[in-house]
Swiss-Prot record:
Any one biological process term the GO annotation gives: asparaginyl-tRNA aminoacylation
Annotated keywords: Aminoacyl-tRNA synthetase, ATP-binding, Cytoplasm, Ligase, Nucleotide-binding, Protein biosynthesis
InterPro entries referenced in this protein's UniProt entry, alphabetically: Aa-tRNA-synt_II, aa-tRNA-synth_II, aa-tRNA-synth_II/BPL/LPL, Asn-tRNA-ligase, Asp/Asn-tRNA-synth_IIb, NA-bd_OB-fold, NA-bd_OB_tRNA
Gene behind the chain: asnS1
Protein name from the UniProt record: Asparagine--tRNA ligase
PANTHER family assigned: ASPARAGINE--TRNA LIGASE, MITOCHONDRIAL-RELATED (PTHR22594:SF34), ASPARTYL/LYSYL-TRNA SYNTHETASE (PTHR22594)
Organism placement in taxonomy: Bacteria, Bacillati, Bacillota, Bacilli, Lactobacillales
Length: 432
């Protein structure tokens, strides 16, 4: 019986007859030959139907196929150096499953709003396919890395009574006559996991009610957040560098085809896989901006243009360390060498992409953390359970968070993070 294979497996079956189930993305004919552009969820390639090699019924069926028709085919795999994928199939038989007309996403140019309105169909196209395959590889690399480092996957709740960074940018929910919020971070609960299991990472959706229309913001996005007991800030930075360089290396190794679809210059990514990330102090970053004539003073937070300028000065990700206390959340540990700053760091991606990760050593002392909660104007009762972590067996500990879509946007060189998630949620979009 002829073997059923995926397009991705074609290289293992050159000059063999195989079966596939596929969808049609495009078609053209020239008299006695029909060229079919095919996809199956693993890759895209071309099928060729020659009138002299098939029955009249099969040839007419091929000519009558419409965009996104689904069908089974039988044929022989051949190498094809002209294609991204490197192979094509000479079709000898096909069996149509569905063949409706009127598919809305044709091969002409469409505006972004039209494509997002039809996101449920747009995901079938080459570009979204490549991005989602790279997203999947980054997820796999993330899980593999932390499992190999001895971390435990830990699940944080999405409904929260209190928030790690205040409630001004949270979605409020009436929870049986009580206030609740959609989580903007699993970090506080991640710290619980770290003191139970030593090293954990959370991964899941987070929500921020930011009225922002920038290319870097979504209202629903995914975060990966490790927390590590017995780890100081410098050790955390070492871990972050190993992690990010591993992820980029895995994408370069396994996603060459997808990166080629996107036209990504992989030479721009290779330095990130090598490590050796600069650790730039906040003070020095301020000086760089000022020397470039930017209107920026010590104590300001970096805006997107500032981050873009700084990231263009490096060929790989880099850290900005020790931010002022006034512009960071309450749970961070103060820098003993300068108590006006925290032991914290953001990771900035090159090529103008800016912040993709952020973390800190956490404040481990009960009285100090309590004072910082009060200074932030937060209700101590909401954080009583969090303070318990410092009351019973507190240890030095650190953690960080990675914005999944921002990393994908940088690696894929996307203009907007909305392309980095299957169904983007923004202030003006909740469907499909």
């Amino acid at each position: 019986m002829t073997e059923l294979i995926s397009i991705r497996e074609s290289s293992k079956h050159v000059d063999e007859e195989v079966r596939m189930h596929v969808w049609l993305t495009d078609k053209r004919s020239s008299g006695k030959i029909v060229f079919l552009q095919l996809r199956d969820g693993t890759a895209f390639f071309q099928g060729v139907v020659r009138k002299n090699d098939v029955s009249e019924e099969v040839f007419e069926a091929a000519k009558g196929l419409r965009q996104e028709a689904s069908f089974y085919l039988t044929g022989t795999i051949h190498e094809d150096a002209r294609s991204h994928f490197g192979y094509e199939i000479q079709i000898s038989d096909l069996e149509v499953v569905s063949n409706n007309e009127g598919y809305p996403i044709t091969n002409k140019e469409h505006g972004i709003d039209f494509l997002l309105d039809h996101r449920h169909l747009w995901l079938r196209s080459r570009r979204p396919f490549a991005i989602m395959q790279i997203r999947n590889r980054i997820f796999k690399a993330t899980v593999d890395f932390f499992e190999n480092e001895g971390f435990v996957k830990f699940d944080a709740p999405l409904l929260m009574h209190s928030a790690p960074e205040g409630t001004t940018e949270l979605f409020h929910i009436d929870y049986f006559n009580h206030d609740a919020y959609l989580s903007q971070s699993g970090q506080l609960y991640g710290e619980v996991g770290a003191e139970a299991f030593g090293k954990i990472f959370t991964f899941g959706p987070t929500f921020r009610a930011e009225a922002s229309k920038t290319r870097r913001h979504l209202t629903e996005f995914w975060m990966m957040e490790p927390e590590m007991a017995w780890m100081h800030q410098d050790e955390s930075l070492d871990l972050q560098e190993r992690f990010l360089s591993y992820v980029v290396g895995q994408v370069l190794e396994h996603c060459e085809y997808e990166l080629s679809i996107l036209g990504r210059d992989v030479d721009k990514l290779r330095p990130a896989a090598e490590g050796n990330y600069t650790r730039l102090s906040y003070d020095d970053a301020v000086k760089m901006l000022q020397e470039a004539g930017k209107d920026f003073k010590w104590g300001d937070d970096f805006g997107a243009p500032d981050e873009a300028f700084l990231s263009e000065q490096f060929d790989r990700p880099f850290f900005i360390v020790n931010y002022p206390v006034a512009i960071k959340p309450f749970y961070m540990k103060k820098n003993p060498e300068n108590p006006l700053t925290y032991l914290c760091a953001d990771v900035e991606a090159p090529e103008g992409y800016g912040e993709i990760m952020g973390g800190s050593e956490r404040e481990a002392d009960y009285d100090t953390l309590k004072a910082q909660i009060e200074e932030a104007g937060l209700n101590l009762d909401d954080y009583s359970w969090y303070l318990d972590l410092r009351k019973y067996g507190s240890v030095p500990h650190s953690g960080f968070g990675m914005g999944f879509e921002r990393v994908i946007a940088w690696i894929c060189k996307l203009d907007h993070v909305r392309e980095a998630v299957p169904f983007p949620r923004m202030i003006n979009r909740m469907q499909p």
